[in-house]
């Protein structure tokens, strides 16, 4: 275990004026607080925060960050308090230590929800101070290095979370070495057989090519030296996870991989980068399409380098990366490379890491999505997609560079420029030509967005975008449009309700009733009424507490059934019902054009609907005995579907529109309900008559029949019948199946 003076010396090597007192005090305090605590491995617990601090010294971080690393588990696992740490080390360090503690306190049901909440909390904490990320990643790295002592289930869970969240997040923030080590450690536990196989093959390949790599390294160094370029050349081999991922994604065998080895060339200036590139291309043949200039166009994580691939001495492909030493430091440490902290009299007053980097721009954009209303699991899905995706670089007509994930469309581009441009997008010109909005953008495309003030982003756009920002904005706009429709419906319902009550109505009149309704504003009331969450009579009573509902229904005056205050409801057979607004207990009168039910009985026996909203059956129909559900249709009331209806899949992502409803029937119910049967019958004289006889024998009425397909030996048809309930329908289908004239019969749902 590292001694106190050794830690101070490690920091002094890169920061001679280190605040030794702060480091010594944090070391002693953390060691005393953790005391005799042990890790799962049996090692003293204090060895963990000490190793986390050591990892951060490798990044050349300041003493305040090192102190935070030493203290990061004290509040959670010892008797230490935030107040005590504030007094000893200052409020800034105390705040960050407490923030790291909160990241661990989770009690969620699903693994996915835990990951989502972990990521959400981490990103919000990073937005306040990036040192949270640096300590958290170092903490995760040491835990991964010592993961072998855990049980298998826990190893797998931690490794998967590391691969899904922490490794790509380190990459997004530019910390490539950290990302690679996290990936390799996670790969080892997620797929140990594959890790072992790839590792062994790479070791064999390295041994076989060691001499060749040394020769190329020497050749490159000599070329640069002859031309006056001060350069260092270092060979490198792809990591096992990188090799395995490429094999999996591209369907290649190990033998088919051609760029396992590469070289990194580091020079002093940007000018030397391009001079070195020219020398390389004049010495060896380059592979077309493999040149990338990330110096002129940096990645979103601030990575800068020139990539090229050449045909080497033995005709194999060799990848080269050319960069300055400063670029190499940023590529290795990412945001940590920007953390040049300078003591200004207090360890709690450092220069903050620059927030103007591309990595921070991505972070800010990601955090903005947290306020767009996505649930945590959706946020996790969208952010994980962006963590892993490669990039394309496109331009506005004025030359502004827009970086997008691979697979992005003009809609993503529009939202990347500005949310208002995305919301008003109706078309796009790509390189001067009008292209479909689903077009996948490519590197170098110039995109000009066509706009309209009347545009409302359709929900279908969600399937066309690749960025979380676009998806969140589309979802927000869709919710806003639906809410507007609900508000409009609620307005009409309340106008009628207040008119029935003989009371004046306006939006301003609703304001005094807001406290009684427990609603924040008038629009919230209108939307709640439109959604069916709030009965209109409750609103009237909230505004006029002395109001008494004296509406007349057919229970006490059947003659009123045709007057204002009734809704027309049409079932799938086209029958028109008059349903009162008075609620479930009110009677209903069937339109004279339709079949008349027994006197005093309801025509639509459904419970659970709002009395203020019109109700109708879906076209495929439902019969008593079916499990049913109501779907709120903005501006159209409630539609009743059988639970097995395929049409319900369109509402899977809109749970707020689902209403729990049920049948309300009794033995005296005489209403019939439409159902549809698909029949395949033998094509012979009398077959149709036998089918009609089965329906008649079961007291069912066939009100429509259509031939779907006719062949020499059979006929397929759709029969619409009217039945009392599900048992009645099943009995008819069963007897049809038993008929010698019928080869198959089944109910049609949708």
Curated annotation (Swiss-Prot):
SMART domains: HDc, RelA_SpoT. One of its GO terms (cellular component) is plasma membrane. Its EC number is 2.7.6.5. Residues 390-451 form the TGS domain. GO terms for biological process: guanosine tetraphosphate metabolic process; response to starvation. Disruption phenotype: Cells show morphological abnormalities such as branching and swelling forms during vegetative growth. It is unable to persist during stationary phase, presumably because of nutrient limitation occurring during this growth phase. It shows an important growth defect in human HeLa cells and in ovine macrophages MOCL3. At four weeks post infection the number of viable bacteria (deletion mutant) in mouse spleen is markedly reduced compared to the wild-type. The deletion mutant shows very low levels or absence of VirB at all time points of growth. PROSITE patterns: ACT, HD, TGS. It catalyses: GTP + ATP = guanosine 3'-diphosphate 5'-triphosphate + AMP. Gene3D superfamilies: 3.10.20.30, 3.30.70.260, Beta Polymerase, domain 2 (3.30.460.10), Hypothetical protein af1432 (1.10.3210.10). One of its GO terms (molecular function) is guanosine-3',5'-bis(diphosphate) 3'-diphosphatase activity. Residues 45-144 form the HD domain. Disulfide bonds: none annotated. Residues 676-750 form the ACT domain. Keywords: ATP-binding, GTP-binding, Kinase, Nucleotide-binding, Transferase. It comes from the Bacteria. Residues 587-613 are annotated as: Disordered. Pfam families: ACT_4 (PF13291), HD_4 (PF13328), RelA_AH_RIS (PF19296), RelA_SpoT (PF04607), TGS (PF02824). It is an enzyme of class 2 (transferase). NCBIfam families: spoT_relA. Belongs to the RelA/SpoT family. PANTHER family: BIFUNCTIONAL (P)PPGPP SYNTHASE_HYDROLASE SPOT, GUANOSINE-3',5'-BIS DIPHOSPHATE 3'-PYROPHOSPHOHYDROLASE. Functions as a (p)ppGpp synthase. In eubacteria ppGpp (guanosine 3'-diphosphate 5'-diphosphate) is a mediator of the stringent response that coordinates a variety of cellular activities in response to changes in nutritional abundance. It is necessary for persistence in mice, essential for intracellular growth of Brucella and required for expression of the type IV secretion system VirB and therefore plays a role in adaptation of Brucella to its intracellular host environment. This is GTP pyrophosphokinase rsh. It comes from Brucella suis biovar 1 (strain 1330). The gene is rsh.
């Amino acid at each position: 275990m590292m001694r106190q003076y050794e830690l101070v010396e490690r920091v002094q090597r890169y920061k001679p004026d280190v605040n030794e007192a702060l480091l010594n005090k944090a070391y002693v305090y953390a060691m005393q607080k953790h005391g005799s605590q042990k890790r799962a491995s049996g090692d003293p617990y204090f060895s963990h925060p000490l190793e986390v601090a050591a990892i951060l010294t490798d990044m050349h971080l300041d003493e305040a960050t090192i102190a935070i690393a030493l203290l990061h588990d004290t509040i959670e696992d010892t008797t230490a308090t935030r107040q005590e740490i504030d007094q000893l080390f200052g409020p800034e360090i105390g705040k960050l230590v407490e923030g790291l503690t909160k990241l661990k306190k989770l009690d969620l049901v699903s693994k996915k929800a835990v990951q989502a909440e972990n990521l959400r909390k981490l990103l919000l904490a990073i937005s306040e101070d990036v040192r949270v990320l640096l300590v958290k990643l170092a903490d995760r790295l040491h835990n991964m290095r010592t993961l072998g002592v855990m049980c298998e289930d826990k190893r797998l869970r931690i490794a998967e979370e590391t691969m899904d969240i922490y490794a790509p997040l380190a990459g997004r923030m530019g910390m490539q070495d950290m990302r690679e080590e996290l990936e390799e450690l996670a790969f080892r536990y997620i797929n140990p057989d594959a890790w072992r196989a790839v590792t062994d093959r790479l070791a064999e390949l390295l041994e076989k090519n060691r001499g060749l790599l040394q020769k190329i390294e020497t050749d490159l160094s000599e070329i640069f030296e002859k031309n006056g370029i001060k350069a260092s050349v270092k060979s490198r081999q792809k990591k096992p996870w990188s090799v395995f991922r490429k094999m999996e994604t591209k369907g290649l065998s190990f033998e088919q991989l051609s760029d396992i080895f590469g070289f990194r060339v580091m020079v002093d200036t940007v000018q030397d980068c391009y001079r070195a590139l020219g020398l390389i291309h004049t010495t060896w043949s380059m592979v077309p399409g493999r040149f990338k200039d990330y110096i002129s166009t940096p990645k979103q994580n601030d990575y800068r380098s020139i990539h090229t691939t050449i045909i080497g001495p033995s005709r194999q492909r060799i990848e080269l990366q050319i960069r300055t030493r400063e670029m190499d430091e940023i590529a290795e440490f990412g945001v940590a490379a920007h953390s040049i902290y300078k003591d200004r009299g207090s360890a709690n007053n450092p220069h903050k890491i620059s927030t103007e980097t591309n990595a921070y721009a991505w972070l800010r954009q990601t955090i903005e999505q947290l306020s767009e209303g996505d649930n945590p699991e959706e946020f996790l899905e969208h952010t994980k997609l962006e963590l892993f995706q490669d990039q394309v670089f496109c331009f506005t007509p004025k030359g502004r560079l827009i970086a997008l994930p691979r697979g992005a469309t003009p809609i993503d581009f529009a939202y990347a420029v500005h949310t208002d441009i995305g919301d008003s997008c109706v078309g796009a010109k790509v390189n001067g030509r009008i292209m479909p909005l689903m077009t996948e953008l490519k590197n170098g495309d110039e995109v000009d967005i066509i706009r309209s003030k009347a545009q409302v982003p359709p929900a279908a756009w969600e399937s066309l975008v690749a960025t979380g920002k676009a998806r969140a904005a589309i979802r927000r706009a869709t919710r806003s449009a639906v809410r507007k429709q609900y508000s409009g419906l609620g307005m009409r319902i309340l106008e009628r309700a207040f008119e029935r009550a003989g009371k004046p109505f306006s939006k301003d009149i609703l304001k005094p009733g807001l406290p009684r309704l427990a609603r924040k504003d008038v629009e919230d009331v209108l939307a709640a009424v439109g959604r069916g969450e709030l009965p209109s009579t409750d609103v009237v009573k909230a505004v006029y507490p002395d109001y008494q509902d004296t509406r007349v229904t057919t229970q006490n005056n059947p003659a009123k059934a045709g007057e204002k205050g009734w809704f027309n409801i049409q079932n799938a057979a086209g029958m028109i019902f008059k349903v009162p607004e008075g609620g479930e207990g009110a009677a209903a009168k069937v339109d004279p054009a339709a079949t008349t039910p027994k006197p005093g009985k309801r025509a639509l026996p459904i419970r659970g609907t709002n009395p203020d909203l019109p109700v109708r059956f879906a076209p495929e129909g439902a019969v008593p005995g079916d499990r049913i559900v109501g779907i709120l249709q903005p501006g159209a009331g409630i539609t009743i579907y059988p639970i097995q209806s395929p049409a319900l899949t369109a509402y899977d992502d809109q749970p707020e529109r689902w209403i729990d409803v049920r049948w309300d029937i009794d033995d005296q119910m005489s209403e019939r309900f439409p159902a549809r049967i698909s029949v395949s019958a033998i094509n012979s004289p009398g077959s149709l008559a036998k089918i009609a006889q089965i329906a008649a024998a079961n007291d069912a009425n066939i009100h429509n029949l259509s031939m779907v397909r006719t062949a020499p030996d059979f006929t397929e048809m759709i029969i619409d019948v009217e039945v009392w309930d599900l048992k009645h329908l099943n009995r008819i289908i069963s007897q049809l199946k038993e008929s010698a004239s019928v080869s198959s019969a089944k109910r049609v749902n949708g």
